[in-house]
Amino acid sequence: MPGMYRNSMRHHDSTFSLRSRFVALAVGAAAVLAVVSVPAAAEPASSGGLRWEACPAEYELDPASDQCASVAVPRNYAEPDGGTIDVLVTRHRAEDPGSRTGVLFTNPGGPGGDAIGSNRMFVDVLPAAVRAQWDVIGVQPRGLPYAGALSCVMGPEHAMAAGFGFGGAAARAACESDAPGAAAHLTTENTARDWEQVRVALGEESIDIYGLSYGTVLGSTYATLFPDSTGRMVLDSAVDPTWLWNEVLWQQNEGYKGRFNDLMGWIAANNATYGLGETALKVYQRWSDRIVAEAGGNPTIAPPPAQVGDVPPGLEALADAYRSGVDLAGPVRVQFEAFIRGLADPSHTQMSSSIYLMTRQVLPARNSWPLMARVIRDGVEAIPGGGIGGMTEQELERVAQTQMMQSVVMCNENSVAARPDRIPGWLFSTFVTEDLFELLGYSYSAGAFCAGAAPVASLPALSNRGLATAPLVLQGLRDPQTPYLGGAQLAHDMGAHLVTVDGGDHGAGIQGGNAVIDQAVAEYLQTGRTAITHAPEAPIIAPL
């Protein structure tokens, strides 16, 4: 998409394979947020001191309803006279101007989520009453395109460091190679202070907030710094601030494994539709076969527990012993098979499989599970766009640039000490199995990812002091991306009203089709309270 990355990342041809591995890690780690790409043709309007006009064309936003403007903010708030950056802001006008209540700031998570395109996603899924009464506002996080985008020059040494697992140090060095110190201002607190500058530019006395995932940390940071300017705040899929950042990825490991078993079980329960097997273990084998066919290497995540339907005919009397033996041998078997395949050909690795990378991506969003089942049944050709192998060079650079910015922020403000006892697990998962369900957590927790990129800032202690209205937290019980206990902790820290949501969807309020959640969000934003404390899992509304 021309123009989106004006300061694009450059690379040396000899480092392409290692850079591609970095991109594969980024793709595999990405949360599915279903951001809507949406054309922009102008008709400028001005209000609140800002000049509203068509958004950049790549966002494909209709200027009749969605416009953009830029706000100049200090590059360094500790040195306000030290220069500024222009931060792009998008606005979707309240659909019933006569009942307009105020502004609702949104953030899709990350760090590194694009707030311009995602703002339209929020508009599309928010309850109609909210769309009618609020201007929905997206503020592009600093460091991304149209907000002081970093120029990250990935040389051979940076690509090598990233390929070997030291992504944080590689990102910081690559993004500071042209301008030493340029990455130090990329912090959650500075982005929250950018929100305050935008509030003032809009001429609003206060803002309401809808923060998703990392956006719950950003929103809570704003509320802590500017309680008098904070109205009502929805924190969807929240994060324990004491986990930032090494512990967040570690906590995700077990959640993703559990949610993987949920996916296998769901496909088995829908065997009449997909024909992939009536047990989770049989579905797993079909999934594994597809990955081997695509990449030559088999997955190493442990197979799901065996069920009665997995016991061969004639062994029913020994079913319990058989199942116990299969469960005991399964993890060792798949790792041994992957090791042997790798010896035969080192290029045969699960990380080369688009199906494997896609699997981890879809786990937090059940509406993507029907597509995943079709991909397992029909092969990689069923992946829209052809998967990572079908990505253009520009798309690969876009993913890598987003991952660069995320890495910089996370290492800039990491507050969790490294666990040297987890170094063996990091080495094994990174250099032997290349198992995404293990290596991301081990890489951060062991201290490898941010090694050589020491923190330069810290978050303020998050609190509800001075807030007129208690926040609302929506938290999924089996959400692998932001585990439930972390959300409950942030709810405690912020004195929030907690709504527990069944299932494991990440972003309870953005999945669509959950009338109870829609009611809770609308009631809360309109009145400042809701009596709802529990919501069912959202139905799958995607076609099977």
Where do the model's predicted regions map?
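Conserved acidic catalytic loop of the alpha/beta-hydrolase fold
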Residues: 192-206
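Catalytic-loop region of hydrolases
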Residues: 2-28, 35-160, 514-544
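Catalytic histidine-centered segment of alpha/beta-hydrolase-like enzymes
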Residues: 505-515
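Alpha/beta-hydrolase fold active-site neighborhood
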Residues: 287-462
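Alpha/beta-hydrolase fold nucleophile elbow
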Residues: 204-214
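Conserved alpha/beta-hydrolase "acid-adjacent" motif
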Residues: 480-485
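Short beta-strand/loop motif that positions the catalytic acidic residue
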Residues: 466-467, 472-475
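A catalytic-pocket lid/entrance helix-loop region that shapes and gates access to the active site
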Residues: 223-286
